[in-house]
Every structure is written in structure tokens, then in C-alpha cells.
């Protein structure tokens, strides 16, 4: 496209207002779109792509073997890249400005036409949120004030169907399936993870070489691409074609149903007063997370989101530890039906991994460090993490606990969660080693969250997480009267007898047995205080924080600073929290579209893990939210430079409410009620207010308060 010009169209006032409100990220006045590395994306949790990128990704579609021996010609399991049929270029147009509309989940480019001054062209991309199987592009040409016709030159760039590294592509165009207005392809991966050969049928509008708009006319052209996999149905080819035909006939109506669906998502969110940049970071982080997952497609969440092949598109502990908690407060159904259900669906793979350690006699569910389509281990064999980083199995158990404590969803816990929990406990019972002399249990030869430490013994994070896992499983068994069907005494003995390293003299936790001040990669011991909420004195919490801040590398991921922020706020040291807080979201400031990188200098792009950590710093740090059995705690504080914060439509035990605060007042507002329970607010100012009306409750800023529930009998 033509890009050189001395004068540029200016975005309209409404556009600038949306930028200021934090709902739109924009480039204008000669700024050019960033390279693909820092470019934004559109997605709906089923399908996604980077604008201008060569590949489209469908969740759950991977190419490459589970076991990879490091052969450069034998790519490991990774997201399979579908050619980007939506990558349409208008070659005779001049780029003017563009923006990601976060609220509407659309990306818009605006052009002028040098040969037709006054003609305005808009190119709008979106992944339809309601109809998950389609991508839509609109090219709208406003030639209404021009006295001559205008012709746009179109082409699809970057398409090479014969040299695709991930798929064998069969062109079914001009067969009995299709006509001249659209094209149909059957894409089959080249190498399966194990046995199943995933195929994707793609039906896409044929892109003309040119389109002409008559003088005085304003016209919109639609280009639709539909996807359907043999994961969903055996009739995926005919199904893709049917979806395409149906939606293309309704093309003018697609944008409305897309926006309506995103309006439902944004019922819950976070509002920031006084800092428009921070509001942009918050909204864009939520957008990138929400556009990567959906509740009717349970294929996990990768550190690089759905629009990239970062980390091969695999799911790690990042899902449960970093991304899940902020999503949980806003949309617990999404957590249950996508993130947790992904783990439940893949229990056979977790069992297979446990049994693969034949000389160790492991059993139960040992979740893989890297998981893709089947749930078996897909970490490349040259990386020790796939063998030794095992805390993920405890992390998943504690994520189930978070979900249950927040929702009280006992039916799901009984029907789905409990089976996973029992298998997790069985694994750890087979994994621990008993020291008869000291009558203690150890977990040896492990990699903790600090991945610089390889093959260490008694990682304090791992052991505390495992201890809590056993306590949680026993709690559930007691709740549902199933204690006679588990080895209650043995599991209790392990929970009480695990080695938990602690220096009584200096009141701090060594990271692992023999730790002696080595540099660490990222937050590890600090995670004992949050998210694990392990019982310790304030002195120990502070000592851990001071010690490990000093030995953490400056080139690690941003989540470290989020957790340090949470810790300092918990210790009521606002000044120290502020220093860490600004570092926690520095990794997205290199892109006009606030695309995160893993570290300050680069690494994985569209780093959803960092977004999740950042949002935790806001919600669990400055919101002071803590999820306990039977209650929620709050201790609202304000980040430097802001005038107010609000968590909108937070979910708890089937009810929803707003919690907002400024420099003088905390406002609590009920929105919807679960008729089966009643909520009560307890604070130093109010004693047990039953929350049975929509009338707001006002507390003095600086107050701590608690929401707890009782069943209506």
C-alpha cells in the first residue's frame, strides 16, 4: 500500500474520546503499524491471528510429535499455522490511521485514495464472538461526495499453499462442493501428536483483483472465512461450507451480533480513574486474555495467547497460576468450562505421564509441564522441565480450590473436580520419599518455579503446594462424606510430615535444601504468601520479600514484580509496592497496541502470563482481594497516579457486585442475587450487614472488609 504523504487524515472526535477512555488503541499522524512481533491481534477463543501475519491459529490444532529429540528437521508439537486468507492488502490505498477497538474487539485501518481525493476506505477485521467458526473482514468505501468512480486493487499476501510447513492442503475449489465466489480447502496436519490426524476445512470468500465503487456511493464489501475441524464433527468439510454460506448471506448483520456478545463479556471489568494509560493497559490485557479462550472450546491457554505460536501454543502452570485468578473473579464460568475443563478432559494423559516413570512406580495424575492436544507431555526432551518441574500438578489442584471457594459449585466439584483431586493426591503420595530416621517426607530432584534451580531437593514452594493439595483433597472428601474411600490417615500424615524449610533464627524460607543465595529467575518463595497464602508471620513474609528481591535477576518475567507488589501492599508498605508496581507492566510499553513481551528485552510475545500477573497486582494487590473458604477479604488501596479503582460485576457464590473506591470512600453495590444464599458484609465500621438490597454501602477509604455467605434454609 502507499504510505508516503506529508498530510494525514485525523481520526474523528469520537475516536479520540475512546482512546482517552481506554477503549481504543490508536496510531495516526504518520505512525506506521509495528512489525508482526509487536502487532495486535483479533480472536474469539476458537480462532485468532495477528493482523498482517501469515498464519491463523485454531485452538487445539497442533502439528508435530509429542516426543521430540531436538532434531531441527523434526519440529516439536506446536500450533499449526493455517494460511491467513484474511490478509488482504489494498495496494493503491494510502494508510492514514488505525486502531484496536478493545471494547468491540475489532481492528480498523483507515485509508485515503491518492487518485481519488476525498474517498475514505475502512478495513475492519474481527473474529466473530458469537459464531466462533468465522473470521470477518469488512472493506467499506465512502465515495459519496466524489463525482467519479473509484477502483481498489486487492490481493491476499503471504499465501503459499504448496509450501505450508504444518498442513497438507487439498484445494476443493470448483468441485461439487463450491462455486466461483468462494474457495474450499481441506487442511490435514503432517505429523500427529500421537495418532489422531487433525483436519481443518476452510471456506473463504474469493478475493477479486479489484472492486469498483460508483460516484456518490457508499458501499461495504464482506470477506468471510469459516473453519471447522474433524475434532468437532466428521462432516467438517460440508459443515465449513454450510457455516460459510449461512453467515455470508447474513453478512450485514454479523457485526451487531459480534458486538452484542462482547458487550456481555464487558459487563465485568476494571475501571481506573485518573490514569488513562493504566486503563488502556488493563482493558487491553483483559481483551487479549478473553479473546484467547471461550467457554465452549476447552483447549487451554498458552503463555502466548491464541494468536501466536509462542511457547508452541502449549499450556503450562502459567494457566492456573497467572492467568486463571483474575479471569475467575470476573467470569468463573469461563474458568470452569475452558481452563479447568481442559485439564479434566486430559486426565488420561496425566495418568499416562505418571505411569511413564516406571522405575519410580508413580501413579495417579501427574500433569505434563507442557500440554497440547491430548494432554500427554509434549515438552521437548532436551528441556529438563518436562521431567522435573512437577509443581504444576499441585497448582492445578489449588486452582480447583480457588474455583470452588469463589463459586460454591459443589455439583461440578463432585462430578468433575473430585476425580482429578484424588488422582493428584495419589500421584504425590507415590512421589514423596519417607525419611524413617527423621520421620519426614521429602520431594527430591525437582525444578521449582525458579527454573535456574535444576534437580534440587525440597523446594519450599513445591512442598507447601503439595501439603495444601493433600489438605484440600481431605477437605473435599470430608465435605462429600467420602473419607472411607481414600487413605485418609496416610494422606494426612504426608500433609503434616512434609519438609517445609524454614530458618528459625533468621525467620525466612530457603528456596530449597542447600540454597545459598544464588540468583533466581523469578518469584518463587514469595509465592508462599500469595497466591498460596501459607500461614506465616509478617516478619517472615517481609524477610522473604527483602531477601529474594535482592537476588532476583532483572531480566526475568514481569509477574515477579506483580507478586512483590501484592506482598508489599499486604505488609502495608505503599512506597515499596509502588516501586514494584510500575515495573510489573513495563513490558507492554514498547507497542502502540500494548502487546506484552515476556521480559523487558523481548522473549515470548503477546505474553498473556505477564498480563495475568499484572491484573493480579491490581485486583489482589490494590484490591486486596483474598479468596477463602466461606468468605472474601478486601483491602482496597490506590496505585500512585490514580484517583479511583472499581472492580465491576465481580462474581461470588452466584451473586454479582461492584466494589469501587477513591481517596475517601469505598462503595459496595450488589447487582444480582443468588436466592440460595445470603451474603453479609463485615467491617470495622459495620457489623454484619445482610446484603439483600441494591442500595450501595459506603465505607471509609482504608477500611478492610469481608464478604461471607450463609445458605438460605
From Swiss-Prot:
Catalyzes the hydrolysis of glucose from the disaccharide unit linked to hydroxylysine residues of collagen and collagen-like proteins. PANTHER family: GLYCOSYL HYDROLASE-RELATED, PROTEIN-GLUCOSYLGALACTOSYLHYDROXYLYSINE GLUCOSIDASE. It catalyses: (5R)-5-O-[alpha-D-glucosyl-(1->2)-beta-D-galactosyl]-5-hydroxy-L-lysyl-[collagen] + H2O = (5R)-5-O-(beta-D-galactosyl)-5-hydroxy-L-lysyl-[collagen] + D-glucose. One of its GO terms (biological process) is carbohydrate metabolic process. It is found in: Secreted. Its EC number is 3.2.1.107. Pfam families: Glyco_hydro_65C, Glyco_hydro_65m. The active site is at 451 (proton donor). Residues 1-21 form the signal peptide. It comes from Dictyostelium discoideum (Social amoeba). Glycans are attached at residues 104, 160, 171, 186, 283, 361, 457, 481, 535, 576, 662. Substrate binds at residues 317-318, 521-522. This is Protein-glucosylgalactosylhydroxylysine glucosidase. One of its GO terms (cellular component) is extracellular region. InterPro entries: 6-hairpin_glycosidase_sf, 6hp_glycosidase-like_sf, Glyco_hydro_65_C, Glyco_hydro_65_M. Belongs to the glycosyl hydrolase 65 family. It is an enzyme of class 3 (hydrolase). The keyword Ribosomal protein does not apply. The gene is pgghg.
Amino acid at each position: 500500500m502507499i504510505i508516503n504523504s506529508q498530510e494525514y487524515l485525523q481520526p474523528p472526535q469520537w475516536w479520540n474520546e475512546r482512546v482517552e477512555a481506554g477503549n481504543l488503541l490508536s496510531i495516526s499522524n504518520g505512525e506506521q503499524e509495528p512489525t508482526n512481533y509487536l502487532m495486535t491481534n483479533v480472536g474469539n477463543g476458537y480462532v485468532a491471528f495477528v493482523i498482517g501475519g501469515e498464519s491463523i491459529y485454531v485452538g487445539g490444532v497442533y502439528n508435530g510429535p509429542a516426543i521430540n529429540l531436538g532434531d531441527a528437521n523434526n519440529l516439536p508439537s506446536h500450533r499449526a499455522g493455517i494460511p491467513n486468507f484474511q490478509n488482504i492488502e489494498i495496494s493503491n490505498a494510502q494508510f492514514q490511521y488505525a486502531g484496536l477497538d478493545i471494547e468491540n474487539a475489532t481492528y480498523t485501518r483507515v485509508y485515503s485514495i491518492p487518485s481519488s481525493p476525498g474517498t475514505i476506505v475502512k478495513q475492519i477485521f474481527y473474529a466473530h464472538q458469537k459464531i466462533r467458526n468465522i473470521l470477518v473482514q469488512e472493506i467499506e468505501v465512502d465515495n459519496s461526495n466524489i463525482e467519479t468512480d473509484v477502483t481498489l486493487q486487492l490481493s491476499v499476501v503471504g499465501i503459499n499453499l504448496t509450501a505450508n510447513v504444518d498442513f497438507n492442503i487439498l484445494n476443493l475449489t470448483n468441485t461439487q462442493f463450491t462455486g466461483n465466489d468462494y474457495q474450499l480447502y481441506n487442511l490435514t496436519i503432517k505429523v500427529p501428536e500421537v495418532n489422531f490426524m487433525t483436519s481443518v476445512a476452510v471456506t473463504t470468500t474469493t478475493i477479486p483483483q479489484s472492486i469498483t465503487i460508483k460516484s456518490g456511493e457508499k458501499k461495504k464489501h464482506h470477506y468471510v472465512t469459516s473453519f471447522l475441524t474433524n475434532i468437532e464433527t466428521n462432516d467438517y468439510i460440508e459443515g465449513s461450507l454450510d457455516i460459510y454460506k449461512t453467515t455470508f448471506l447474513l453478512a450485514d448483520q454479523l457485526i451487531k451480533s459480534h458486538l452484542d456478545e462482547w458487550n456481555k463479556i464487558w459487563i465485568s471489568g476494571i475501571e481506573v480513574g485518573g490514569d488513562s494509560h493504566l486503563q488502556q493497559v488493563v482493558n487491553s490485557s483483559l481483551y487479549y486474555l478473553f479473546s484467547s479462550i471461550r467457554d465452549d472450546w476447552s483447549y487451554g491457554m498458552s503463555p502466548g495467547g491464541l494468536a501466536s505460536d509462542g511457547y508452541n501454543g502449549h499450556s503450562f502452570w502459567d494457566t492456573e497460576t497467572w492467568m486463571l485468578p483474575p479471569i475467575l473473579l470476573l467470569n468463573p464460568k469461563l474458568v470452569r468450562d475452558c481452563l479447568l475443563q481442559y485439564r479434566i478432559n486430559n486426565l488420561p494423559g496425566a495418568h499416562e505421564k505418571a505411569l511413564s516413570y516406571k522405575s519410580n512406580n508413580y501413579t495417579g495424575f501427574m500433569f505434563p509441564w507442557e500440554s497440547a492436544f491430548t494432554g500427554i507431555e509434549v515438552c521437548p526432551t532436551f528441556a529438563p522441565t518436562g521431567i522435573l518441574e512437577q509443581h504444576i500438578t499441585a497448582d492445578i489442584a489449588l486452582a480447583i480450590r480457588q474455583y470452588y471457594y469463589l463459586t460454591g459449585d459443589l455439583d461440578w466439584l463432585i462430578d468433575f473436580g473430585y476425580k482429578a483431586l484424588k488422582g493428584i493426591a495419589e500421584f504425590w503420595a507415590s512421589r514423596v520419599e519417607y525419611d524413617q530416621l527423621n520421620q519426614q517426607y521429602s520431594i527430591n530432584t525437582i525444578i521449582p518455579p525458579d527454573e535456574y534451580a535444576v534437580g534440587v531437593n525440597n523446594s519450599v514452594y513445591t512442598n507447601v503446594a503439595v501439603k495444601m493439595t493433600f489438605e484440600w483433597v481431605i477437605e473435599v472428601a470430608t465435605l462429600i462424606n467420602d473419607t472411607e474411600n481414600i487413605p485418609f490417615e496416610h494422606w494426612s500424615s504426608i500433609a503434616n510430615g512434609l519438609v517445609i524449610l524454614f530458618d528459625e533464627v533468621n525467620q525466612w524460607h530457603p528456596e530449597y535444601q542447600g540454597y545459598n543465595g544464588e540468583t533466581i529467575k523469578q518469584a518463587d518463595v514469595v509465592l508462599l504468601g500469595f497466591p498460596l497464602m501459607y500461614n506465616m508471620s509478617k516478619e517472615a513474609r517481609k524477610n522473604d520479600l527483602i531477601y529474594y528481591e535482592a537476588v532476583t535477576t532483572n531480566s526475568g518475567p514481569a509477574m515477579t514484580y506483580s507478586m512483590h507488589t501484592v506482598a508489599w501492599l499486604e505488609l502495608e508498605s505503599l512506597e515499596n509496592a509502588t516501586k514494584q508496581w510500575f515495573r510489573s507492566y513495563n513490558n507492554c510499553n514498547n507497542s502502540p497496541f500494548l502487546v506484552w513481551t515476556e521480559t523487558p528485552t523481548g522473549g515470548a510475545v503477546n505474553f498473556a502470563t505477564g498480563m495475568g500477573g499484572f491484573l493480579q497486582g491490581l485486583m489482589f494487590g490494590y484490591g486486596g482481594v483474598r479468596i477463602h473458604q466461606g468468605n472474601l477479604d478486601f483491602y482496597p488501596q490506590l496505585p500512585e497516579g490514580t484517583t479511583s479503582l472499581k472492580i465491576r460485576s465481580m462474581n461470588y457464590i452466584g451473586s454479582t457486585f461492584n466494589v469501587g473506591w477513591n481517596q475517601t470512600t469505598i462503595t459496595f453495590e450488589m447487582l444480582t442475587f443468588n436466592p440460595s444464599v445470603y451474603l453479609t458484609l463485615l467491617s470495622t465500621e459495620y457489623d454484619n450487614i445482610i446484603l439483600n438490597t441494591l442500595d450501595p454501602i459506603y465505607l471509609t477509604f482504608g477500611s478492610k472488609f469481608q464478604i461471607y455467605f450463609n445458605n438460605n434454609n
